[in-house]
Regions:
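Small-residue-biased structural context
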Residues: 1-177
């Protein structure tokens, strides 16, 4: 088995992880980091907008979009942490298709919000002479967008299909059950 290394702890390929390991990875690699980084990005965006509001390239409206993304993500992650992930850890497949459809819809909404972040940040193109705060804002927002895209991909392409396929599989109605 190929092992990806991300620094100190080697991480096995996600497709090779069991459900509990994959959920733990999502919680630590994505949920915890989104919660840690988003409030700082919102504050930094507010600062850059306030200080540079008269600069034509200023990312006006970025703080508002990041704040909305933070609220959307928090609601989404809570649904996963308190409803979906516990059911998945217990191997529940009955009735799981509807919550998965809702969460996939959330992912589509997040993708649109990522697009708005990139639009407000003008593709993360810094103006000449941009201050350190502006540089940190764009670096952090770019990382957030990349992380969130990967987070969505891991759930949509690796975790969710395991349950969608199992829940949609025809059941044997024979004597052996």
């Amino acid at each position: 088995m190929r092992v990806e290394t991300t620094g100190v702890n080697p991480v096995p390929p996600l497709a090779a992880m069991n459900v509990a390991g994959l959920i733990d990875h999502i919680l630590s690699r994505y949920h915890a980091i989104h919660r840690q980084e988003l409030p700082d990005l919102v504050a930094l965006a507010r600062k850059v907008e306030r200080v540079h509001h008269a600069v034509p390239e200023a990312p006006l409206g970025l703080a508002e979009v990041l704040e909305r993304l933070s609220a959307e993500l928090e609601a989404h992650m809570r649904k996963e942490e308190f409803v979906l992930f516990p059911a998945m850890r217990q191997g529940v497949k009955e009735g799981i298709l509807q919550p998965l459809a809702v969460l996939r819809h959330d992912h589509d909404d997040h993708a649109e919000t990522i697009r708005l972040v990139e639009e407000r940040a003008r593709g993360f193109a810094l103006p000449e002479g941009a201050c350190g705060s502006w540089q940190r804002l764009y670096a952090g927002a770019r990382k957030l967008c990349a992380d969130l895209r990967e987070h969505i991909r891991v759930e949509n392409e690796v975790l969710f299909p395991r349950f969608e396929l199992a829940a949609a599989a025809p059941r044997c109605i024979c004597a052996h059950g």
